[in-house]
Design a protein with these regions (language model features):
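Conserved beta-strand-loop surface patch within small alpha/beta domains used
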Residues: 1-99, 108-168
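Residue-level "edge-of-site" marker
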Residues: 105
Length: 168
């Protein structure tokens, strides 16, 4: 999977203000749990993010079922249903409106890409899902910051990239 065939995975994206506002609202509504979801855009405008789909954070469900394997709760971890994610990516590609970003929030922590995030979304230098990542920080019930993260090819690391808010 390369940035040439899927340019949004390389970053430098532009998000419509209404979409960023909705991501932030989702983060505030979910607090003190992490929120998560997908952001889409037209395939023929690779940098544009113009729609989102909220997803349920299933971290607490997994933690209740198997706290040894899933020791973290939704306050510090998010888990999207993998089958639903695969179907969403496939449908987006088929519709010409691919998933370009997975977003999630951090509660009372910065908008960094955590070691857990890196381990979840990259393995042996390969990106697990063909997208970039937005992390929104909610501190004491208020949005503090937001950052876009992209995979460093050939590593399990991620770097910050430019995310521009597109005013109406």
């Amino acid at each position: 999977m390369s940035g040439e065939s899927l340019p949004w995975i390389s970053g430098d994206l532009e998000i419509e203000k209404s979409v960023m506002d909705e991501i932030e609202q989702h983060a505030l509504e979910g607090y003190p749990s992490e929120s998560c979801g997908f952001v889409f855009g037209p395939a023929d405008q690779p940098a544009l993010l113009d729609a989102l789909q909220r997803e349920a954070n299933e971290a607490d469900k997994y933690h209740r079922l198997d706290p040894v394997t899933f020791p973290r709760t939704s306050n510090t971890y998010f888990k999207i249903n993998e089958l639903r994610a695969a179907r969403t990516f496939e449908q987006g590609q088929n519709d010409g409106r691919p998933v370009k970003v997975i977003y999630h929030s951090h509660c009372d922590a910065g908008a960094y890409f955590s070691d857990e995030d890196s381990a979840t979304f990259a393995n042996e230098g390969q990106l697990m899902w063909p997208c970039a990542y937005i992390v929104v920080s909610v501190m004491n019930g208020e949005v503090a910051e937001r950052r876009l993260w992209v995979h460093e090819p050939g590593t399990n690391g991620f770097r910050e990239s430019t995310l521009t808010i597109r005013e109406p």
